[in-house]
Amino acid sequence: MDLQLKGKKALVSGSTAGIGLAIATTLASEGAAVIIAGRGNEKLQRARESIQSASGNKVDVVAVAADLATAEGGETMINAVADIDILVNNLGIYEAKSFFDLQDSDWMSVFLINVMSGIRLARHYMRGMLERNFGRIIFISSESGIMTPPEMIHYGLTKSAQLAVARGLAELTRGTNVTVNSVLPGPTRSEGVVDFLQSMASKPDPTPEEAEKEFFQKHRSSSLLQRLIDPREVANLTAFIASPLSSATNGAALRAEGGLIRSIY
């Protein structure tokens, strides 16, 4: 299937590893010109080369050194790239921490990174999309936005907030060819996740396989997949939603969580 992304310009935040890198790679493979961002120049350039190679060197991949978790970094990106067709807000952090140990600074930090980074970019780029009557904005939320994990309540709050923002922005696109949607991955095999699962294991020094099995048995027992999701599985859905072919999908929260959420709506 041709996703009709050739000639489209896509910005993916949090794109030097994991889900973001997979999304950027998939979009580039479909012919989109891709913009990525990161704080560390070496890692940023490695990601750029990887994406460029995967596309067969057929598309432009622009790497902008900017910390999109900050307002200053957002301005750097906007100054470097004035207009885009597709915005994928993927930047995010997570940490397992008891509710009773969470300080005000913990709540604010995760909110500023997970929520405000996407709001800043959408606030700028959505204007141009509406003026040109085409655009796609996608928030990479999480199943945690619906099923708040007790070990990461602050994280769950930010993912619920993303769903609210995305739906609210979709309401502003009425009668246009601009859409705003959310994608909800489940636990995904990305950078740092294996260490995270091992840190939650009941016995010391478990193998990655043991930690993964225990995590799904104890903490995500409702998952039908019963394994970590591959980032490319999330990227495939995201690429379709970024495509002109998805024009009837707007204001939706689309799941790629392996059947973890036990509801049909």
Features from the language model and the residues they span:
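Conserved glycine-rich cofactor-binding loop
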Residues: 9, 16-17
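Substrate-binding pocket helix/loop in short-chain dehydrogenase/reductase
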Residues: 98-99, 106-111, 219
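Active-site helix of classical SDR
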Residues: 122, 158, 166
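Alpha-helical segment proximal to the catalytic Tyr-Lys
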Residues: 127, 171-172, 247
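Residue(s) in the substrate-gating loop at a strand-loop-helix junction
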Residues: 142
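Short C-terminal tail/terminal secondary-structure segment
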Residues: 147, 238-239, 245, 250-265
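Short, small/polar-rich loop/turn modules that mediate ligand/substrate recognition or access, typified
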Residues: 174, 179, 249-251
